[in-house]
Swiss-Prot record:
Species in which this protein is naturally found: Saccharomyces cerevisiae (strain ATCC 204508 / S288c)
Similarity comment: family membership: Belongs to the EMP24/GP25L family.
Disulphide bonds in the chain: none
Residues annotated as transmembrane: 175-195
Annotated Gene Ontology cellular component terms: COPII-coated ER to Golgi transport vesicle; endoplasmic reticulum; endoplasmic reticulum membrane; endoplasmic reticulum-Golgi intermediate compartment; Golgi apparatus; membrane
Location within or outside the cell: Endoplasmic reticulum membrane
Protein name: Protein ERP4
Signal sequence extent: 1-21
Highest classification ranks of the organism: Eukaryota, Fungi, Dikarya, Ascomycota, Saccharomycotina
Superkingdom: Eukaryota
Positions of the GOLD domain: 36-118
Length: 207
């Protein structure tokens, strides 16, 4: 009986953690230079709590502006020249919240990944002992899964940034090499013309 209960707990926990993890997913947004993009989220209860995080993956200096506006139009969060950030947003009233990202720095387009995750509601305490143990096990698995997911997202973002930096450096080195070659060719042509001018002027003097 205990084995069957344990199997049932593990099975239900795997289903619930999958459900919790599938409730949200990172949204990729492309921000051309000097543009602004906004996302919207409706909170239906004053007890709702929203976990908000974003990170810049590629583009220039990886810096953007970020604002959160409450349903009444008041700006509750303002960030400038940030590469990444995390918020725990408690309700400022029921209604539609606006999350805006602006690329106001540099002429490079930027790719941003943003996550809006509604925090789980606290389960009622009027439960049996077995249900409490099962819920604790589920919550522990869910917390560990969230930690792993956030760590993987962070590492992936760093990999994107490093790849973009390497690609940008390679492009700059290529153009710098072409510029140096052009300068060397130009100097060689000027030297040849100067030498030719000297020889031509000497021949005229002899004549």
């Amino acid at each position: 009986m205990r084995v069957f209960t344990l199997i049932a707990i593990l099975f239900s926990s795997s289903l619930l953690t999958h459900a919790f993890s599938s409730n949200y997913a990172p949204v990729g947004i492309s921000l051309p230079a000097f543009t602004k993009e906004c996302l919207y989220y409706d909170l239906s209860s004053d007890k709702d709590v929203l976990v908000v995080s974003y990170q810049v993956l590629t583009g220039g200096n990886f810096e953007i502006d970020f604002d959160i506006t409450a349903p009444d139009g008041s700006v509750i969060v303002t960030e400038r020249q940030k590469k990444h950030s995390d918020f725990l947003l408690k309700s400022f009233g029921i209604g539609k919240y606006t999350f805006c990202l602006s690329n106001n720095y540099g002429t490079s387009p930027k790719k941003v990944e943003i996550t809006l995750e509604k925090e789980k509601e606290i389960v009622s305490s009027h439960e049996s002992k077995e249900d409490i143990i099962a819920n604790n096990a589920i919550e522990e698995i869910d917390r560990n899964l969230n930690k792993i997911t956030k760590t993987m997202d962070y590492l992936r973002a760093r990999e994107w940034r490093n790849m973009y930096t390497v690609s940008s450096t390679e492009s700059r080195l290529t153009w710098l090499s072409l510029l140096i070659m052009g300068v060397m060719v130009g100097i060689s042509i000027v030297q040849a013309l100067i030498i030719q001018f000297f020889f031509t002027s000497r021949q005229k003097n002899y004549v």
